[in-house]
Amino acid sequence: MDDNSIQQSLLADNPNVLQRKPSEGVNRFRRCRSTPSTDPLQGPPEKGSSVKAKELFKEMRPSFRLVGLLLFIYLLVGVLAFYAVMDEISGKRTNRVLDALYFCVVTMTTVGYGDLVPNNDTTKLLACAFVFMGMAVVALFVSKVADYLVEKQEVLFFKALHTNLKGGETKMLRAIETNRIKYKFYTNALLLVLSIISGTVFLWKVEKLSLVDSFYCVCATITTLGYGDKSFSSKLGRVFAVFWIITSTIIMAQFFMYLAEIYTERRQKMLANWVLTRKMTKMDLEAADLDDDRQVGAAEFVVYKLKELGKINQEEISSFLEEFEKLDVDHSGTLSPYDLTLAQSAQ
């Protein structure tokens, strides 16, 4: 792209754009295009700036019903399949239907205790197919259901603090976005502790394992290590295991994912702090001067800072400028409703 097109797109040479003190009319025009109107004619804001959680988070809620349906179908098909070949699966039995469901869950979560194992080629191939499908279902379940549960807790937490957030809905959303990862991590860590405690106590009291063996079995299960020397052997134990294994392995996977996400976010914040606090140099000014007029306007400065933060790259900037030139039908260096009308009619 030549210098003239860049100059037109950044509007550095247009005296009507990026003035230091834009007129009140311009301010109102820009605000009404980017934020909700504060014009008195539009009516006063709602009393107390009440925020309805259902409306505020309508688009944020993940659609997990399909994932839940896939999980149900997987377990149903798995129970029917393994029930049909249960005679070809060796190990300690309790109930044919329960054992089929238990084996399906152990296979899906890749725990693999070894207390029930396929002993012919047909059941081995069936187990191979179900373990791959099960991992895909678990991955979808992790990304949908866990996020939904944590965001429900965020809504309740911020509704309690709503009276202290005078900025209203916008400020509330900003606060949630800033602390989202931390809340997910802390909530997930608490759920992980509760899962470990509940599994250990159950194995200790119901399966009659020692306290150390119970904790050992829990750790081998939630990490999907599954040595197989300790497992759920009673009928009640396998009923508990069907639900506990699914939830605990999902929680464990989420825990390490959020831990890595917190580390990544911290690195990003350190970079952002360095970019925003360091002093500009002459070399920085030269790099930010996109139109080579020896002056850096507000638009150029913002673009340069975004590039430093890694939020935008040169290819994206070029594509935005190309889009601007296509919309600027009259080549005035600015966009107006008239330009948009002409651009739409030309398509």
Swiss-Prot record:
The EF-hand domain covers 276-311, 315-347
Q: Sorted alphabetically, which Gene3D superfamilies does this protein's record hold?
A: 1.10.287.70
**Stated consequence of mutating residue 326 to N:** Mainly targeted to protein storage vacuole
GO biological processes: intracellular potassium ion homeostasis; potassium ion transmembrane transport
What spans are recorded as compositionally biased (Polar residues)?
1-11
The observed outcome of changing residue 330 to H is: Mainly targeted to large vacuole and partly to the ER
Main localization, broad class: membrane
Q: Where is this region: Disordered?
A: 1-49
* UniProt keywords, alphabetically: Calcium, Ion channel, Ion transport, Membrane, Metal-binding, Potassium, Potassium channel, Potassium transport, Repeat, Transmembrane, Transmembrane helix, Transport, Vacuole
Transmembrane regions: 66-86, 125-145, 184-204, 239-259
GO cellular component, alphabetical, reads:
plant-type vacuole membrane; plasma membrane; potassium ion-transporting ATPase complex
- Give the top-rank taxon of the lineage listed in the UniProt record for this protein: Eukaryota
Q: How does it sit in the membrane?
A: Multi-pass membrane protein
Q: What is the effect of changing residue 313 to S?
A: Equally targeted to large vacuole and protein storage vacuole. Almost completely targeted to protein storage vacuole
Segments forming a coiled coil: none
The entry's Ca(2+) 2-binding residues are 328, 330, 332, 334, 339
Q: Does the keyword RNA-binding apply?
A: no
Oligomeric state and interaction partners are given as: Homodimer.
Q: What is this protein's function per UniProt?
A: Highly selective inward-rectifying potassium channel that is specifically located in the tonoplast of large vacuoles. Functions independently of the voltage difference across the membrane.
Q: What is known of its domains?
A: Each of the two pore-forming region (also called P-domain or P-loop) is enclosed by two transmembrane segments (2P/4TM) and contains the GYGD signature motif which seems to be involved in potassium selectivity.
What is the official name of this protein in its record?
Answer: Two pore potassium channel a
Source organism of this protein record: Oryza sativa subsp. japonica (Rice)
Q: Which gene encodes it?
A: TPKA
